Amino acid sequence: MDASTVIADMVAFMHPDDCDQLFVPSSTRESMPLVPNYALNEDGVDSVKVLMATRNLIVFEAFRPKGAVDRTHMHADHHSVAYQKMGRVRMMIDADTYIVEAGDTYRHPMGVKHQHEALLDSIRIEIKYYPDGNAIESWNALVGGTHTGE
């Protein structure tokens, strides 16, 4: 593997053995509660496991229980695209609100305010794209450390 692609840092919510791999057996990994750095009274709104990490991308699966809602926030360092795998959420993106159901896809560009409210138990697959190549450092700062599930 080219040395420029090697990830030396630990990735929060990703098992250490899975870092910098071309194939990740994530089906054998457990999710962990996440409390993002913008949270107020959101004690583990999502349960997350990182599926893949590179310098520019973080791909994760997130479970959110019915009724859980995060506060309106935005990210200045990355774009997000999400696929709703299960359930239903009310998704506010900028000034628009959408009801997102299983099979739907949505995005919130860098710097755009957004908020999720789980109307049913929900699972999404989210891809965060960091154009500056600081995905791991930014992800670890967002989620408050390097919880790896070891």
Per-segment meaning from a language model:
Residues S4, N56-L57, A62, Q115-E150:
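Double-stranded beta-helix
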Residues V45, I58-A76:
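Conserved short histidine dyad/triad with adjacent acidic residue
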Residues A68, D104, V112, L120-S122:
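Surface-exposed loop/turn positions
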Residues R55, M92-D96, L119:
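Short strand-coil-strand connectors
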Residues D94-G111:
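Short acidic-glycine-tyrosine-enriched beta hairpin
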Residues M1-N56, R71, V143-E150:
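A short, N-terminal "cap"/entry segment at the start of jelly-roll beta-barrel domains
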Residues D77-V89:
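Glycine- and acidic-residue-biased ligand/ion/polar-headgroup-sensing regions
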